[in-house]
């Protein structure tokens, strides 16, 4: 007969493996739309470890419902998303790229922007929410915003606390056609 200690330890390992796996379904976008319209904007939302970025998928879905094509994925998928964005931009189907990320997704957002910069592609907006580690925002990013937890917020509630701000930035930047600074 298995002891409760062994069962508990096994359960913890299963839960940890589930959360660490980027492809268990929660990171797949319900808001991912067909390819961006001719010369349009696209928002990439990068979730943190185990896709445990409460409210960020819903934020991405709400932006998609407002007509901005949105892709919601786990932070580990940023290299493939960068390649997709490069192809879309170079083909003329994408004019404006915006990236939002939380925790490890915030760090990945900066990495993705840097990869786009190496391809000579501007990024309209990068929003990070309590990113892990300090990253230098690359020069191809027109505007960057970093939200950190403050009075009463924690690593997860920072998303809910700044949803309106994020919406304003994303919706405002999707209409902007200004040069990259």
Regions found by a protein language model. Give the residues of each.
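Bacterial N-terminal signal peptides that target proteins for export
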Residues: 1-11
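Bacterial N-terminal signal peptides
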Residues: 10-20
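Signal peptide processing junction and immediate N-terminal pro/mature segment
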Residues: 21-31
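Active-site catalytic motif of lipid deacylating hydrolases and related acyltransferases
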Residues: 30-95, 155
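Lipolytic serine-hydrolase domain surface
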Residues: 43, 51, 56-57, 139-181
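Gly/Ala-rich beta-loop-alpha elbow adjacent to hydrolase catalytic centers
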Residues: 101, 105, 109
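Short glycine-enriched nucleophile-adjacent loop
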Residues: 109-117
């Amino acid at each position: 007969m298995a002891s409760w200690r062994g069962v508990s330890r096994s359960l913890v390992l299963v839960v940890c493996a589930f959360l660490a796996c980027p492809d268990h379904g929660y990171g797949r976008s319900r808001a991912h739309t067909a390819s961006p319209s001719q010369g349009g904007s696209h928002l990439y939302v990068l979730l943190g470890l185990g896709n445990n970025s409460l409210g960020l998928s819903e934020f991405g879905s709400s932006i998609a419902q407002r007509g901005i094509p949105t892709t919601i994925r786990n932070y580990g998928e940023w290299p493939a998303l960068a390649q997709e964005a490069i192809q879309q931009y170079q083909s003329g189907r994408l004019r404006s790229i915006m990236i939002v990320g939380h925790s490890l997704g915030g760090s990945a957002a900066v990495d993705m922007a840097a990869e786009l910069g190496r391809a000579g592609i501007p990024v309209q907006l990068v929003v990070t929410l309590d990113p892990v580690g300090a990253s230098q925002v690359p020069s191809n990013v027109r505007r960057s915003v970093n939200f950190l937890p403050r009075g009463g917020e924690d690593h997860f509630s920072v998303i809910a606390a700044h949803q309106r701000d994020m919406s304003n930035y994303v919706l405002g930047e999707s209409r902007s056609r200004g040069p990259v600074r």
